Amino acid sequence: MQKSSLLLFLLLLTVVIVHGQRTSAVKPKREKSGFAAIPMINYNRTQGVIVGALVSNYYKLNKKDTISPSSNTGLFGMYTQQKSYAAFAFSRFYIAQDRWRVSAAAGTMDINFQFYLEDPAASTGNFYDYTTKANLLVLQVQRNIFNRIYFGPTASFIKSTTSFAFPGVSGEDSVSVSKLNNIGYIITNDTRDHVQNPTRGMFLNFKNQFYRDWMGSDYKFERYIVSYNQFFKLSKKDDTKVLALRATFNVAAGDVPFEGQTVVGGDDIRGYSQGQFRNDQVYTLQTEYRWNFYKRWGMVAFAGLASAVASFSDIPKSDILPGVGAGIRFKMLPSEKINIGVDAGVGRGDYSITFRIGESFGR
């Protein structure tokens, strides 16, 4: 159960640490470093009111390096009406004319969430509460190996303690203490004109993670994560209209514990916030229309489909989960093209309202 919260937290962490970065697929412009302090307020059905803040600084490691995007270091924290909290520090460095990309993040959290359990004797199920306390460290290094292709190792160290609302849910005790350490590699093909807010190009990412006892993990399985993002500029005159497409799959294989499953929601398919749909494999398709309609103001409209299954062959007979919605944007830090905004999405029997920093489809 704790993996659902951990995945949501790692997703948020991943989105934050890439803010404001730009690839060198097109001729770069010199930009001044910038400091951003962005407050956050949000609401969803499981956490109630959420408040927080992001403090981040953008800078050049080498002022003579006009090719590397701005490096980024910051802090993020949040607290919710359900007494959940999360805090972490992060850095992402672009080194030696963008030949090296290094990122690191460390954080702690205490999340009160829920999971959905079907009743075999009935046609419906029930939600049950649980609490996860966790500390984590994420490291990643990539080297440019050909054109816009990057390759390198990645590792995560996670220790968590989960307390369930009633005994026996974990299969053993009402409290589960576990380590979900992993090591792997990541391959990226990035031709976008801007990482944070692209108008054209492609971002293809493949990550393979191995959970092993020699890494200190309590579980032995593999995870394969693929995300394909494509961006099209719809206007020849300017960059005010963009169409973004995204396809993902998140597959866990082997002796996958319940904690290793993926929850439907987040940027991959907006409109879901209750944690009802989860499985070993989650596949998504999504499209988003972006329109910068007035100076620093913009809007988005999005629609997508998701499927949560035990194996790929189950997709034809599984429930297809739609998600549609729209959002408003404001360019908070023009020098780094960072937008803030709010997205409202509707899914199957669920909805989500999300305050966001940066655009979707950035990982």
Which residues does each PLM region occupy?
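Bacterial Sec-dependent N-terminal signal peptides
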Residues: 1-25, 232
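Short loop/turn motifs that connect adjacent beta-strands in outer-membrane beta-barrel proteins
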Residues: 22-33, 61-70, 96-101, 147-148, ...
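Gram-negative/organellar outer-membrane beta-barrel architecture
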Residues: 26-36, 41-179, 339, 345-363
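Transmembrane beta-strands of outer-membrane beta-barrel proteins
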Residues: 35-37, 71-75, 101-104, 151-153, ...
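Sequence/structural signature of outer-membrane beta-barrel proteins
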Residues: 58-62, 76-82, 109-113, 158-162, ...
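Extracellular loop and loop/strand-boundary signature of outer-membrane beta-barrel proteins
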Residues: 75-76, 122-127, 168-174, 211-216, ...
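Outer-membrane beta-barrel "beta-signal"
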Residues: 184-187, 325-330, 335, 350-363
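C-terminal outer-membrane beta-barrel translocator/porin domains of Gram-negative envelope proteins
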Residues: 188, 194-293, 299-302
